[in-house]
Curated annotation (Swiss-Prot):
Protein name in the entry: Omega-hexatoxin-Hi1b
Tissue expr: Expressed by the venom gland.
Family affiliation: Belongs to the neurotoxin 08 (Shiva) family. 01 (omega toxin) subfamily.
Source species: Hadronyche infensa (Fraser island funnel-web spider)
Domain notes for this protein: The presence of a 'disulfide through disulfide knot' structurally defines this protein as a knottin.
Location of the protein in the cell: Secreted
InterPro entries documented for this protein: Omega-atracotox
Amino acid sequence: MNTATGFIVLLVLATVIGCISADFQGGFEPYEEEDAERIFRRSPTCIPTGQPCPYNENCCSQSCTYKANENGNQVKRCD
């Protein structure tokens, strides 16, 4: 066995031992649902006045009306 092969064998062995010890320490336990919600929770943001709005509830003013844009097309914008 040459040096490179021995190094690869030691690397694989260390990886296997590391995975086994992580499992014993609870490293591979699944997340609880509350943890996942906490990790992926986004802070509430609102769309400022004059910006396009797909839904009324996303506007800071809670109001959205059709207005002409620079091309003369009617688009919904937050009031």
